[in-house]
Amino acid sequence: MARRAVKAKSRAKVKAKAPRRGRVASARRVTAAKRKTAAKRKTAAKSKTAAKSKPSAAKRQRPIELYYWPTPNGWKISIMLEECRLPYVMKPVNIAAGDQFKPEFLAISPNNRMPAIVDPDGPGGRPISVFESGAILQYLGRKTGRFYPSDERARTAVEEWLFWQMGGLGPMAGQAHHFRIYAPERLPYAIDRYTNEVNRLYGVMNIRLKDRPFLAGKYSIADMACVGWVSRWERQGQDINDFPHLKLWLETLMARPAVQRGMKLRVEEASQVDMKDPKVRSLLFAQRARTA
């Protein structure tokens, strides 16, 4: 009798445990299902956020209009557009044919100088035109968040060298080009003045690049602004071998695919311009103020 009582109790315990195990298993299944549902919702939310943050395909394909001719100033912008892989359509401004004086171009660039851009997707989604190469580089840097740092200290370094080029290297090298190559007569004083100043500026760059690969530390719009001018060192009466750090910098930039692509645009067409043609020389070198 005692044995039967013990067996009966054991059976009762087993029966009592069975529902508990079932309830635990069921609870686990419910928890797992809830986790899966939550994970799916999270993934869906992330997908929606990503979709919102990405511009539509149609919007991405709206090209920037680049008003351009192959000069050191024009190259700045074609290089930046290539580096950023921004879609653009090139609108040639043949400065030897007077395209820079056409009313439609003056509406974009009142200084009758290229480069200039029109961005159909400007601030607020409205088109914006920008002239002056330095201003365009800054605009594109802000637009893309590339090659123009947001950190104030780093950005200041980039701006220092960008403005150094705009106010120094570009104008002085341009005058060296003019008096060494295009002037109708040789003027020793002018040739020496600008050749020597370009030499001084190359020395400034060479010292700056002694302990860093790029002008502002990292590759930036400051380097893009300078490379076209330095690439023409022979025209400026310089020997790049006198500036080893500058030479290495130039070789590094000229090896970049985007720089190569940007500097190839329309070069062949520009090379066919006859710079001895009086009409061409008048358009480029003899302009005076125009009345409205």
Q: What residues fall within each predicted segment?
A:
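Short secondary-structure boundary/hinge segments and terminal tails
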Residues: 98-99, 251, 270-272
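GST-like fold's C-terminal all-alpha helical module
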Residues: 153, 165-262
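Flexible loop residues that form catalytic
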Residues: 122, 229, 267
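Active-site-flanking alpha-helical
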Residues: 80, 141, 229-230, 263
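Low-complexity, polybasic segments enriched for Lys interleaved with small residues
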Residues: 2, 6-45, 49-51, 56
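Acidic/histidine-enriched, glycine/proline-rich intrinsically disordered or flexible terminal extensions
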Residues: 267-292
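Short, solvent-exposed turn/loop segments enriched in Gly/Ser/Thr/Pro and often Arg
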Residues: 94, 221, 266-267
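GST-like domain detector, emphasizing the conserved glutathione-binding G-site
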Residues: 3-5, 11-15, 48-192, 196, ...
